[in-house]
């Protein structure tokens, strides 16, 4: 994330460990691979080696008086919640608190601990990361730009009695199928309100349109049921954490999106499709049916964001007003971001 590089792995007992990827000697990264398996970390520069937990193991050529306990790799915070791994870079030893409780409850029926990555696509989007969040936080653009998405969802449906009655009926359908899972808690047109002051996370279950039991092009299942679900028609669970993650979880698959800003003009985006770990491609699911819905929708958004970025770079651009009816969440995101910038300024002054 920016200049921060963090190694996330598991120790010999399976415990999660996060380490800042910089040797305590001269700063060389000790891990340069995307993924893999090692018995210890070895700096490629002067061969200092570290145990998986970051403790310094060897440092040949150094003074015998060196206190090895003082020169382990610096730890970052890490925790697993409902199958998602969260890493934080600040000094707060455990900032999750209420978020951990809420997210764990929402994610419990999805069974992400028993999921596997069926497919992954890495994108380089020529847009500032904040423009990507602006795009994510409103669906005013959806009818013009996401014909596949609006067929499946109520995010941009008109707010009238007909729509509300339809959503109520679909919510009732989902409630019958949910069983032990969390019930629909966003039963109205439009997007769930997020973010809000002091809350960098949210989780909500939203109804799908009639004839859709999953987010696929035709609404039909694309993979075996995940987790605790006994039926497909459970709507979608949506999880969001600013500044860099969101996911849509249907009963049979999850699509997770992670942002990594690479400068003011570029954002690296990773999109992953997850299914139950027992599911086998070609036997239990067809990637040709699993991928298109969110691949098409995501790439439509990346195109919008890149074009928007070019427009705001125009010297003649002056920001216009937000729509209070359609862009409330964009306003909320701007407020969240400005508050974080102000907080950082206060910390710097201290």
Each model region followed by its residue ranges:
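Rieske [2Fe-2S] iron-sulfur-binding domain
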Residues: 1-91, 95-109
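C-terminal catalytic domain of Rieske-type non-heme iron oxygenases
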Residues: 15, 79, 84-350
């Amino acid at each position: 994330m920016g200049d921060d590089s963090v190694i996330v792995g598991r120790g010999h007992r399976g415990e999660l460990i996060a380490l800042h990827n910089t040797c305590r000697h001269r700063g060389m990264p000790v891990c340069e691979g995307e993924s893999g398996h090692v018995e210890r970390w070895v700096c490629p520069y002067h061969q200092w080696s570290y145990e998986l937990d970051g403790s310094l193991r060897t440092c040949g050529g150094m003074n015998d008086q060196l206190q090895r306990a003082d020169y382990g790799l610096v730890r970052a915070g890490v925790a697993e919640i409902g199958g998602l791994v969260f890493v934080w870079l600040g000094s707060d030893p455990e900032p999750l608190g209420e978020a951990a409780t809420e997210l764990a409850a929402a994610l419990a029926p999805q069974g992400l601990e028993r999921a596997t990555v069926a497919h992954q696509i890495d994108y380089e989007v020529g847009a500032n990361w904040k423009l990507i969040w602006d795009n994510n936080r409103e669906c005013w653009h959806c009818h013009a730009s996401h014909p596949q998405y609006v067929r499946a969802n109520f995010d941009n449906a008109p707010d009238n009695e007909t729509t509300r009655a339809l959503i109520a009926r679909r919510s009732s359908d989902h409630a019958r199928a949910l069983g032990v899972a969390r019930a629909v808690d966003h039963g109205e047109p439009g997007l769930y309100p997020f973010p809000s002051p002091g809350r960098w996370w949210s989780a909500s279950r939203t109804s799908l349109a009639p004839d859709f039991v999953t987010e696929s092009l035709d609404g039909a299942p694309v993979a075996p049921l995940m987790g605790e679900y006994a039926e497909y028609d459970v709507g979608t669970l949506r999880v969001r954490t600013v500044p860099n993650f969101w996911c849509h979880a249907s009963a049979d698959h999850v699509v997770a999106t992670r942002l990594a800003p690479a400068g003011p003009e570029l954002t690296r985006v990773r999109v992953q499709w997850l299914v139950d770990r027992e599911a086998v491609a070609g036997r239990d699911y067809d990637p040709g049916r699993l991928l298109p819905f969110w691949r098409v929708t995501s790439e439509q958004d990346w195109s919008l964001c890149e074009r928007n970025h070019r427009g705001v770079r125009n010297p003649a651009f002056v920001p216009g007003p937000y729509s209070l009816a359609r862009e409330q969440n964009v306003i909320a995101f701007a407020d969240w971001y400005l508050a974080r910038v102000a907080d950082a300024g206060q910390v710097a002054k201290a």
